[in-house]
């Protein structure tokens, strides 16, 4: 599991406004942590692109349909939630945008 890879992940159970159901998510934790720990940090991806907020990263042609990475939906999960192999890997220019969105959302 590597930073920037996109996996289908089962985010249930969820509470309130947390991203839910099975959805693609991008791994944002560092590779050394991904190798050593039983968890990874991910950011949820949605195909609801009606509004793009400053903490979102638009993905026009990365998945089957236009989508966005939602940096406000970041969480650490068990690797057991990952459903199969990665479906793609975000290119470095998009990962830089994800990093910027995370910095904005987390005030880093």
Please report, for each region that a protein language model flagged, where it lies by residue.
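Conserved functional hotspots at enzyme active or ligand-binding sites that engage polyanionic ligands
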Residues: 1-108
């Amino acid at each position: 599991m590597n930073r920037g890879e996109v996996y289908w992940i089962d985010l249930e159970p969820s509470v309130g406004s947390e991203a839910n159901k099975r959805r693609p998510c991008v791994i944002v934790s560092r590779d050394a942590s991904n190798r050593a720990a039983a968890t990874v940090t991910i950011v949820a991806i949605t195909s609801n692109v009606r509004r793009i907020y400053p903490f979102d990263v638009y993905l026009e042609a990365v998945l089957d349909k236009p989508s966005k990475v939602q940096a406000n939906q970041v969480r650490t999960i068990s690797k057991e939630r990952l459903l199969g192999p990665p479906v793609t890997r975000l290119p470095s220019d998009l990962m830089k945008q994800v990093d910027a969105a995370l910095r904005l959302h987390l005030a880093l």
